[in-house]
């Protein structure tokens, strides 16, 4: 019987990262989305192309063997597909997980297969599958919760691949960097074993992979974006061509490296090599990635467990240095009223209407007695003072 994966999110990451590797692994992919335009395009097209870009050139793969369902109008079809699938993945954004959970819960509840469904959230957030699992349990009858592990297993993942903004006329085709990393927990699958997806690096402990990725790739990428935006740069490559900004990114990643090395017992040499790889990757001019795209959704990016406050708070607790991370936070807080970015508008409103300490709590989620908190308040106060 053919393997089937149901994937929520027909966007660039869904088509260009997750679906590409599911397709390569021999799965039929069923895309689920609420965007009429994406679903219609997928339904009316037999294939699309994923072009991997590197300094060595380009390589194009053709993706076929997929279907698409609009969950807004055909939820029962989505439930039926999940009930007979091998894998469910998603790349919808952490804030959307609660909206896709009801259909997944119903699909899981309808399963009769001997092997449980593998559920893997592919989001830029720590513990995203745990979050989705929580929402699914909220949408499952109490008397069915105890037997849910017979029907589904949930594994957190760490994904790493840069998907830049796409050309307006690209249609379903996706340009994407060649490099990728997709690490997924293996332990939740127990005696059933994990699904067969060669692109996945199966690990027993995911936290080192998630934190190393989030606090290096995402921290460095966002730092370049926010400093670049405030310096009038157009692309990430242009920002990193500026020796001042490149030096700042290195300083920030030196701080996060000290945390990663100390906490996860990764060698300094290995982490330094990883940092150099990341800086080379995000400097790639062929990706043509804009500072606005990488910087979008600043409120999520300055939140408690994210790329700035996450490492800075842990460094503060350990007595480490976090001054450069505070600089990144400041630049992120100056990413206000950017066209097409609702969070940047809301950010400006919060900073305008709240006292520094109140704004710091609301934006970062830090407790007022946390050792990092007074330093964050000082940054917020400085940004607010400049706006007066």
Curated annotation (Swiss-Prot):
Q: Where does NAD(+) bind?
A: 5-16
**Which Gene3D superfamilies has this protein been placed in?**
N-(1-d-carboxylethyl)-l-norvaline Dehydrogenase, domain 2, NAD(P)-binding Rossmann-like Domain
Question: Might you name a Gene Ontology BP term for this protein?
Answer: mannitol catabolic process
Name a GO molecular-function annotation. mannitol-1-phosphate 5-dehydrogenase activity
Q: What is the E.C. number?
A: 1.1.1.17
In the UniProt record, which is one GO cellular component term? cytosol
Xref: InterPro entries: 6-PGluconate_DH-like_C_sf (IPR008927), 6PGD_dom2 (IPR013328), Mannitol_1_phos_5_DH (IPR023028), Mannitol_DH (IPR000669), Mannitol_DH_C (IPR013118), Mannitol_DH_N (IPR013131), NAD(P)-bd_dom_sf (IPR036291)
Q: Which residues form the active site?
A: 213
User: Catalytic activity annotated for this protein?
Assistant: D-mannitol 1-phosphate + NAD(+) = beta-D-fructose 6-phosphate + NADH + H(+)
The alphabetized UniProt keywords are:
NAD, Oxidoreductase
Record family assignment: Belongs to the mannitol dehydrogenase family.
NCBIfam families according to UniProt: PRK02318.2-5
User: What interactions and quaternary structure are annotated?
Assistant: Monomer.
What role does it play? Catalyzes the NAD(H)-dependent interconversion of D-fructose 6-phosphate and D-mannitol 1-phosphate in the mannitol metabolic pathway.
Check the record and name the PANTHER family matching this protein: ALTRONATE OXIDOREDUCTASE-RELATED (PTHR30524:SF0), MANNITOL-1-PHOSPHATE 5-DEHYDROGENASE (PTHR30524)
Q: What is this protein called?
A: Mannitol-1-phosphate 5-dehydrogenase
User: Source taxonomy lineage?
Assistant: Eukaryota, Fungi, Dikarya, Ascomycota, Pezizomycotina
């Amino acid at each position: 019987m053919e393997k089937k994966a149901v994937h929520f999110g027909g966007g660039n990451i869904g088509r260009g990262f997750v679906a590409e590797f599911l397709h390569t692994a021999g799965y039929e992919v069923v895309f689920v989305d609420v965007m009429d335009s994406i679903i219609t395009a997928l339904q009316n097209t037999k294939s699309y192309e994923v072009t991997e870009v590197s300094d060595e050139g380009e390589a194009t793969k053709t993706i076929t063997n997929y279907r698409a369902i609009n969950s807004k109008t055909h939820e029962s079809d989505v439930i039926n597909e999940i009930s007979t699938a091998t894998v469910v993945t998603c790349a919808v954004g952490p804030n959307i997980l609660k909206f896709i959970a009801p259909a997944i819960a119903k699909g899981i509840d309808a399963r009769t297969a001997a092997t449980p469904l593998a559920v893997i959230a592919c989001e830029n957030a720590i513990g995203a599958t745990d979050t989705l699992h929580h929402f699914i349990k909220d949408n499952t009858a109490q008397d069915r919760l105890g037997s849910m592990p017979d029907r589904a297993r949930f594994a957190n993942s760490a994904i790493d691949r840069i998907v830049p903004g796409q050309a307006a006329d690209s249609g379903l085709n996706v340009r994407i960097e060649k490099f990728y990393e997709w690490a997924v927990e293996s332990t939740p699958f127990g005696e059933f074993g994990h699904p067969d997806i060669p692109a996945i690096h199966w690990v027993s402990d995911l936290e080192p992979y998630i934190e190393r990725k989030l606090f290096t790739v995402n921290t460095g990428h966002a730092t370049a974006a926010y400093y670049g935006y405030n310096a009038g740069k157009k692309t990430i490559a242009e920002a990193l061509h500026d020796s001042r900004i490149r030096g700042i990114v290195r300083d920030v990643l030196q701080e996060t490296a000290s945390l990663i090395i100390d906490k996860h017992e990764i060698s300094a040499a290995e982490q330094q090599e990883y940092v150099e790889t990341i800086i080379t990757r995000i400097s790639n001019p062929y990706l043509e990635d804009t500072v606005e795209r990488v910087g979008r959704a600043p409120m999520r990016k300055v939140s408690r467990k994210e790329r700035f406050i996450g490492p800075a708070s842990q460094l503060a607790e350990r007595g480490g240095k976090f001054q450069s991370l505070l600089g990144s936070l400041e630049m992120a807080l100056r990413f206000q009223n950017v066209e097409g970015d609702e969070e940047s508008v809301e950010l400006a409103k919060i900073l305008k209407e709240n006292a520094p300490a109140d704004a710091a709590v609301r934006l970062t989620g830090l407790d007022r007695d946390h050792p990092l908190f007074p330093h964050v308040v000082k940054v917020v106060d400085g940004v607010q003072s400049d706006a007066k």
